Amino acid sequence: MATLQDIGVSALINLFGAFLFLIAFAVLRIQPINDRVYFPKWYLTGERNSPRRSDRTLVGKFVNLNYKTYFTFLNWMPQAMKMSESEIIRHAGLDSAIFLRIYTLGLKIFAPVMVLALVVLVPVNVSSGTLFFLKKELVVSNIDKLSISNVQPKSSKFFFHIAVEYIFTFWACFMLYREYNNVAIMRLQYLASQRRRPEQFTVVVRNVPDMPGHSVPDTVDQFFKTNHPEHYLCHQAVYNANTYAKLVKQRAKLQRWFDYYVLKHQRNPHKQPTCRTGFLGLWGKRVDSIEYYKQQIKEFDHNMSLERQKVLKDSKLMLPVAFVSFDSRWGAAVCAQTQQSKNPTLWLTSSAPEPRDIYWQNLAIPFISLTIRKLVIGVSVFALVFFYMIPIAFVQSLANLEGLDRVAPFLRPVTRLDFIKSFLQGFLPGLALKIFLWILPTVLLIMSKIEGYIALSTLERRAAAKYYYFMLVNVFLGSIIAGTAFEQLHSFLHQSPSQIPRTIGVSIPMKATFFITYIMVDGWAGIAGEILRLKPLVIFHLKNMFIVKTEEDRVRAMDPGFVDFKETIPSLQLYFLLGIVYTAVTPILLPFILIFFAFAYLVYRHQIINVYNQQYESCGAFWPHVHGRIIASLLISQLLLMGLLASKKAADSTPLLIILPILTLSFHKYCKHRFEPAFRQYPLEEAMAKDKLEKETEPELNMKADLADAYLHPIFHSFEKEVELSSSSSSEKETHQEETPEVRVDKHETQSSSPVTELGTSSHHHHVYNSTSPSSHYASAYEQSSSQYEYHYNTHQYEEHEYRYN
């Protein structure tokens, strides 16, 4: 069990590590060569240029020669606090702003309660002496005397703990209500203030019935013209284009090589670039690089055009899914919230995600298999949770060396060394647990994808839910149970079964020492590592040296990342759980929790402003999950305290806690009915008000033209019609120029993107793909440098969307 000395060693190690990370970040961020790594958000919005261009000296292009900036290396902290919440919403979206509010909620809940608990409960716990009399039977440390374990059984002092639990519950519920209300208002205001966006007018229809003699588009068109004649506008069929998407990815690679050799030739016109045609360009016939890749692209485009025509013509590749658009938000909201058919399993409608939020691959999953998939994944997650009990038990064995010493005395020569003992108990357990948890979010996201959800935001929320249950069962309950077993192994083996509940009741509060070490590793050093961005830094420079060939490649190499909701939100909920549970049990843990919330808020604020570029905008759809799991933490805390008092034989005071879970559940039920509907559906009142305002300001608005291809698969995004390859070079050129429109969105707007200019805003450009053969265009680009980039940059869009369907 970790002692005060062990906690001190762990604190020094983690504080020193965090300090080193912050110093390294402060120095690396001001170097010109690293500017794209630490400020990619501003490059994507077009508001920042590389400082290397303005410095004329060779050394100055790589190293910051202004010595004054090294004395203000901590100025990133006040800079991160300057941007207001409304500015963050405009800059990074509502999801990012609401995510930051989780940290401020933690500070608001725990700061006043920490003062109360430290002033009231710590003196009460210390003044008792139960552990002094039990130290021969149990493994205890000085820090455990600050916990409820040190209070004597049947003591009247337990009324103080019950009073603090009541005060904390009422305060937490008050803050949760205020925050839920504020977030709901922010969401509705954000939706009301948005420009026209395709998801506001569109629903996704699944399980379209197969009508003999009718195609899916005809069936959908006829059904909605019949049942929604006043508001139905158009629809977009969905194709299984996963095979074609792979071809798009391969073609993009060829395009990048072609761009690279064209640029290389422009820089040195007197030398013709060449390459070998063999494996990895290491052997084979040496050929003209530009002509070789131009021919490769021409042949590839021919194959892609054939595949595209196959996708559009083959009825087997047309899915029983459609995106149906209406001429008003009200019409779309009514359709999404009502049953469309007397058979409730057909014509299933729901509000459409925004176009960049769609996970296209899962649209091809048959609806009938979704239930089976969810059942299989549910069983798999259950098995995974219990499989991970093994490494959790191993971690707890490291944290409880005294318990092992009594059973295995041969370990004493190693564990008696002070530094080894402090390192093993104070630092290593938290680090080991962090390592074991590292790969889990990715595994759980893959499981969520298998379940068949069609929106990335939903996938991440489902993965986050799985990760939370995992953290609850394994990290919290598993660490307590396994830790208590290892800690008091000698007692369990040498005492009567009737004494085991008393031992558990005394030992559970002592696990706060393990969680303190975990908080310092994950919440202090881990958060400092987040701002350092060591992995993206190394990868960027490796790509810059070996892979980057064009400016487009350099933009891709920046990899700004995004707030990983599937990992960060469950981790946050674990911190809430620890703080809530240990407030009345071991309040000494609260200062460590508060330091985490304050430091993490500062770091993530900086990252959201300067680094992250979100994949999608869900308008804070994750908040009901955050609220619900904090309520669950309150219930766990109350039940745990009841169990502890029962094990302490506090028969007079324990019944006073029975009413608390009932009040908490009643509060949760009220909030669920009061606020959650606004996060599930678009209110008809809001939709109608927005429609009326729009009709008054733009009475001649043509919505059909804007919504026609808003939900076309990204690789078919510019148009949906068959294209015949022309053998004439001039014909090819005309076809390309006519059928490859470039859909641009204002790059200075950083809210959720949309592929339709009139309907959305974006933080980066969206470009459209043309599946016709552009061979003549490549020749023109090769000969006329002024026109080459107009086409070449179009391939970037496919790779942005590739991860969604591949």
Curated annotation (Swiss-Prot):
<dbReference type="InterPro" id="IPR027815">
    <property type="entry name" value="CSC1/OSCA1-like_cyt"/>
</dbReference>
<keyword id="KW-0406">Ion transport</keyword>
<feature type="transmembrane region" description="Helical">
    <location>
        <begin position="102"/>
        <end position="122"/>
    </location>
</feature>
<feature type="transmembrane region" description="Helical">
    <location>
        <begin position="650"/>
        <end position="670"/>
    </location>
</feature>
<dbReference type="GO" id="GO:0005886">
    <property type="term" value="C:plasma membrane"/>
</dbReference>
<dbReference type="InterPro" id="IPR003864">
    <property type="entry name" value="CSC1/OSCA1-like_7TM"/>
</dbReference>
<feature type="transmembrane region" description="Helical">
    <location>
        <begin position="576"/>
        <end position="596"/>
    </location>
</feature>
<keyword id="KW-0813">Transport</keyword>
<dbReference type="InterPro" id="IPR032880">
    <property type="entry name" value="Csc1/OSCA1-like_N"/>
</dbReference>
<keyword id="KW-0333">Golgi apparatus</keyword>
<keyword id="KW-0407">Ion channel</keyword>
<dbReference type="GO" id="GO:0009506">
    <property type="term" value="C:plasmodesma"/>
</dbReference>
<keyword id="KW-1003">Cell membrane</keyword>
<feature type="transmembrane region" description="Helical">
    <location>
        <begin position="427"/>
        <end position="447"/>
    </location>
</feature>
<feature type="region of interest" description="Disordered">
    <location>
        <begin position="726"/>
        <end position="786"/>
    </location>
</feature>
<comment type="similarity">
    <text>Belongs to the CSC1 (TC 1.A.17) family.</text>
</comment>
<dbReference type="Pfam" id="PF02714">
    <property type="entry name" value="RSN1_7TM"/>
</dbReference>
<dbReference type="Pfam" id="PF14703">
    <property type="entry name" value="PHM7_cyt"/>
</dbReference>
<dbReference type="GO" id="GO:0005227">
    <property type="term" value="F:calcium-activated cation channel activity"/>
</dbReference>
<comment type="function">
    <text>Acts as an osmosensitive calcium-permeable cation channel.</text>
</comment>
<dbReference type="GO" id="GO:0008381">
    <property type="term" value="F:mechanosensitive monoatomic ion channel activity"/>
</dbReference>
<dbReference type="GO" id="GO:0005794">
    <property type="term" value="C:Golgi apparatus"/>
</dbReference>
<keyword id="KW-0106">Calcium</keyword>
<feature type="transmembrane region" description="Helical">
    <location>
        <begin position="157"/>
        <end position="177"/>
    </location>
</feature>
<feature type="compositionally biased region" description="Polar residues">
    <location>
        <begin position="751"/>
        <end position="762"/>
    </location>
</feature>
<keyword id="KW-0472">Membrane</keyword>
<dbReference type="InterPro" id="IPR045122">
    <property type="entry name" value="Csc1-like"/>
</dbReference>
<keyword id="KW-1133">Transmembrane helix</keyword>
<dbReference type="GO" id="GO:0000139">
    <property type="term" value="C:Golgi membrane"/>
</dbReference>
<feature type="transmembrane region" description="Helical">
    <location>
        <begin position="626"/>
        <end position="646"/>
    </location>
</feature>
<feature type="transmembrane region" description="Helical">
    <location>
        <begin position="7"/>
        <end position="27"/>
    </location>
</feature>
<feature type="compositionally biased region" description="Basic and acidic residues">
    <location>
        <begin position="731"/>
        <end position="750"/>
    </location>
</feature>
<feature type="transmembrane region" description="Helical">
    <location>
        <begin position="375"/>
        <end position="395"/>
    </location>
</feature>
<feature type="transmembrane region" description="Helical">
    <location>
        <begin position="512"/>
        <end position="532"/>
    </location>
</feature>
<feature type="modified residue" description="Phosphothreonine">
    <location>
        <position position="735"/>
    </location>
</feature>
<feature type="transmembrane region" description="Helical">
    <location>
        <begin position="467"/>
        <end position="487"/>
    </location>
</feature>
<feature type="compositionally biased region" description="Low complexity">
    <location>
        <begin position="775"/>
        <end position="786"/>
    </location>
</feature>
<keyword id="KW-0597">Phosphoprotein</keyword>
<dbReference type="Pfam" id="PF13967">
    <property type="entry name" value="RSN1_TM"/>
</dbReference>
<keyword id="KW-0812">Transmembrane</keyword>
<protein>
    <recommendedName>
        <fullName>Hyperosmolality-gated Ca2+ permeable channel 1.8</fullName>
    </recommendedName>
</protein>
